[in-house]
């Protein structure tokens, strides 16, 4: 299922993270729990080999699909599965009642996936910056 694929994809190179099935399931469930959530899955027989999930969000006068998670089974990477999934997503979004203008996502700089996304029509924003802050931050005192 999606959580199993998530663990396979993100616990290997280049991410080398340490997800458990339960953590992955919870993350996907959280993403998919809203009215604006969308999920897409590619199967090879009974096996999930690629998936994307995210949310359709309004930004001023247009909508965009923010892809929160996108993963392809490492054994299927480089075989066009991910590109076909993105093409499928674009076609599905064209069927939505409201026009969806953009696909958007965050990823790590200098990772192999950057060229994959660029080859599928994504480009890096020159103006946007993702920032994080620890909840326990107490200021510069």
Give the positions of each predicted feature.
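Conserved acetyl-CoA-binding loop of GNAT-fold acetyltransferases
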Residues: 109, 118-127
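Conserved beta-strand-loop-alpha-helix junction that forms the acyl-donor binding cleft
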Residues: 77, 103-114, 132-136
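Conserved beta-strand in the GNAT
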Residues: 41, 47-56, 66, 71
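Conserved acetyl-CoA-binding loop-helix of GNAT-fold acetyltransferases
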Residues: 72, 78-91, 119
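Conserved GNAT acetyl-CoA-binding A-motif
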Residues: 86, 94-108
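Conserved GNAT-fold acetyl-CoA-binding loop/helix
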Residues: 7-29, 37
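A short, well-structured alpha-helix characteristic of acyl/acetyltransferase catalytic modules
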Residues: 1-13, 140-141
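A conserved beta-turn-beta hairpin within the catalytic core of GNAT-like acetyltransferases
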Residues: 57-67, 77, 96-101, 125-126
């Amino acid at each position: 299922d999606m959580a199993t694929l998530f663990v396979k994809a993100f616990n290997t190179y280049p991410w080398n993270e340490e997800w458990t099935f339960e953590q992955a399931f919870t993350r996907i469930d959280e993403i998919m729990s809203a009215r604006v959530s969308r999920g897409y899955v590619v199967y090879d027989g009974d096996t999930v080999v690629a998936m994307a999930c995210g949310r359709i969000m309004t930004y001023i006068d247009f909508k965009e699909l923010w892809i929160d998670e996108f993963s392809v089974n490492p054994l299927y990477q480089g075989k066009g599965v991910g590109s076909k999934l993105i093409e499928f997503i674009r076609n599905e979004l064209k069927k939505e009642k409201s026009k969806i203008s953009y696909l958007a996502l965050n990823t790590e700089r200098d990772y192999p996936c950057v060229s994959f996304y660029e080859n599928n029509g994504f480009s890096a924003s020159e103006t946007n910056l993702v920032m994080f802050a620890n909840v326990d931050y107490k200021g510069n005192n």
